[in-house]
A protein has these predicted regions:
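Acidic-and-aromatic substrate-binding clefts and catalytic sites of carbohydrate-active enzymes
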Residues: 18-23, 41-52, 73-81, 108-113, ...
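Aromatic-lined carbohydrate-recognition surfaces of secreted/lumenal glycan-active proteins
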Residues: 43, 97-146, 158-166, 184-188
Length: 188
């Protein structure tokens, strides 16, 4: 499955379209990606989790759409919005299968990790069977005396992992120094 950001703002600024066009420009970009088997996080005609525009059904029912963010990218995952999304999407198991929450990008500091967990609690209470991802590009210890790391800090809420191959190779300098005591420089 593929997902990527497709920024409404950047599209409309690049085209100097400031008066609105009923989402046509965004839809054209989204459709181009979809033709090439790439799904953007936010569906055309998305209403941030409330699903009030019936034109969105053409995307929810499209077999090429394999993933989307149920509340749209960069929208608050408050309980009302999440409940509304669940109420609508749970009408069709295929829509639920395509639903992936992505609300915090690359959480690395305490505030962003706490935000992941806070959203996770909202999802647990209001969107049964939720799938939430958080791209992890590094994995740090939570503090210098801790064996806990970013991964462990959010493991109770994240259930779709997006990591880089070196995500699990943590604390490289420390680990390598134990194999090469006294050596100042190591290549790998």
């Amino acid at each position: 499955k593929t997902q990527m950001d497709l920024s409404w703002y950047n599209i409309y600024v690049a085209h100097k379209c400031f008066e609105g066009d009923d989402s046509l420009l965004y839809k054209n970009y989204y459709d181009y990606l979809l033709e090439n088997r790439i799904c953007a996080y936010t569906l055309p005609y998305d209403t941030a989790g409330y699903y009030t525009d019936e034109r969105i059904l053409q995307y929810l029912n499209n077999p090429r759409v394999v993933a989307f963010n149920p509340i749209a990218w960069k929208k608050d995952a408050d309980a009302d919005r999440v409940r509304a999304a669940y109420k609508f999407l749970s009408q069709n198991p295929a829509w639920m299968e395509k639903s992936y929450f992505y609300v915090v990008d690359e959480p690395t500091d305490k505030a962003s990790l706490d935000r992941v967990n806070a959203v996770g609690e909202v999802l647990k209470e209001n969107f049964p069977g939720y799938k939430m991802m958080a791209p992890e590009h590094v994995n740090y210890a939570l503090n210098k005396d801790s064996t806990a790391d970013n991964f462990s800090a959010v493991q109770n809420c994240i259930n779709v992992w997006c990591y880089k191959p070196y995500f699990y190779t943590t604390f490289a300098e420390y680990r390598y120094s134990s194999y090469t005591p006294g050596q100042k420089l190591t290549y790998w």
